[in-house]
Amino acid sequence: MKVLGLETSCDETGIAIYDTENGLLAHKIYSQIAQHAEYGGVVPELASRDHVRKTLPLIDEVLQEAGMKKSELDAIAYTSGPGLVGALMAGATIGRSLAYALGIPALGVHHMEGHLLAPMLEESQPEMPFIALLVSGGHTQLVRVDGIGEYRLLGQSLDDAAGEAFDKAAKMIGLPYPGGPQIAALAKQGNPKSGLKFPRPMTDRPGLDFSFSGLKTAFLTAVHDALDNDRCDEQFKADAALAFETAVVDTLVIKCRRALEAEGLKQLIIAGGVSANQRLREQLESQLKKIKASVFYARPEFCTDNGAMIAYAGAQRLVNGQSSELSLSIRARWPLSELPPLKES
């Protein structure tokens, strides 16, 4: 089955074709980051307009790369939530209209299920059950995965997501959007012996929930103190970026290890935009070796929003009997736990 995947939940237009027999055939990603950077974040109206403008041309490019015609597609999968309503509507409308014209099924896919399954596109794959850390600008969750659609939430952020905390911290020291890659780049110039240290929120108590608002406040306090004392130079910013990144990474690693031990599992996947962070990957690999556990992740280009993960997730549900929806349905908010389980046939 050859499935066209459309991802338009936020500020990336991702298009891909996944073949259940031959794997990923082609993919393209168009990022709107440059347009939104001047506003310091995503502007929903601009995002939806750009998805409308770019989706059809990208579909043509992906078909050409795969050496296919539209008539050779067997199904279309599109992101139907969670995300920005206008952006979701753009992709869903195009996807369903094209499917109707071709006489093939169209299936709405959960954005975070796409992220969760993205590491399955790689040669090295975990076997279910495993623990998933979903970490992005909008989500920070630990989930036990027993099968496709068999998800149990173990913990989540009670306030800011990790990616959102990176964005806000970056803005405090004058770095552009998106903040995660900017903080990571600047942190490489930081001095680990600067004396700056930020809290690892909620790691001193039981449980698997996260909170990053206090860490963000501690960072802001340090920045204001540096400004008041005329110390907020480039080296201070680099030191602060390193201390902040280290605090976020340590918090995520501690909770991941705790989740694996609590559930008696030895496999972890990390997915979502923050999973591309090199320090996070290195620390997870180092710490999980101590408990003889393994970590899996997607290649960097599939950590951020992309069509490949949507095509793959849609294909898994379609080949295992899930039928296309009769009407257009998108959801700005959509808990993973509400997805139906799907046993492999």
From Swiss-Prot:
Tell me yes or no: is Cytoplasm among this UniProt entry's keywords: yes
Reactions the enzyme catalyzes: L-threonylcarbamoyladenylate + adenosine(37) in tRNA = N(6)-L-threonylcarbamoyladenosine(37) in tRNA + AMP + H(+)
Key word ATP-binding present: no
What does the record say about how the cofactor binds? Binds 1 Fe(2+) ion per subunit.
Note the superkingdom of the native organism.
Bacteria
What keywords sit in the KW lines?
A: Acyltransferase, Cytoplasm, Iron, Metal-binding, Transferase, tRNA processing
This entry's Enzyme Commission designation comes to 2.3.1.234
Quick one: a GO biological-process term for this protein?
tRNA threonylcarbamoyladenosine modification
Subcellular location per UniProt equals:
Cytoplasm
Required cofactor names: Fe(2+)
Matches recorded under Pfam families: TsaD (PF00814)
Q: Which PROSITE patterns match?
A: GLYCOPROTEASE (PS01016)
InterPro entries registered for this protein in UniProt: ATPase_NBD, Gcp-like_dom, KAE1/TsaD, Peptidase_M22_CS, TsaD
Q: Mind naming one GO cellular-component term on file for this protein?
A: cytoplasm
Enzyme class comes to transferase
| Residues where substrate binds | 134-138, 167, 180, 277
| Primary residence | cytoplasm
- What does the similarity note say? Belongs to the KAE1 / TsaD family.
Q: What does this protein do?
A: Required for the formation of a threonylcarbamoyl group on adenosine at position 37 (t(6)A37) in tRNAs that read codons beginning with adenine. Is involved in the transfer of the threonylcarbamoyl moiety of threonylcarbamoyl-AMP (TC-AMP) to the N6 group of A37, together with TsaE and TsaB. TsaD likely plays a direct catalytic role in this reaction.
The record's annotation in NCBIfam families points to: gcp_kae1 (TIGR00329), T6A_TsaD_YgjD (TIGR03723)
User: What name goes with this protein?
Assistant: tRNA N6-adenosine threonylcarbamoyltransferase
Q: What's the source species for this entry?
A: Marinomonas sp. (strain MWYL1)
Its taxonomic placement starts with: Bacteria, Pseudomonadati, Pseudomonadota, Gammaproteobacteria, Oceanospirillales
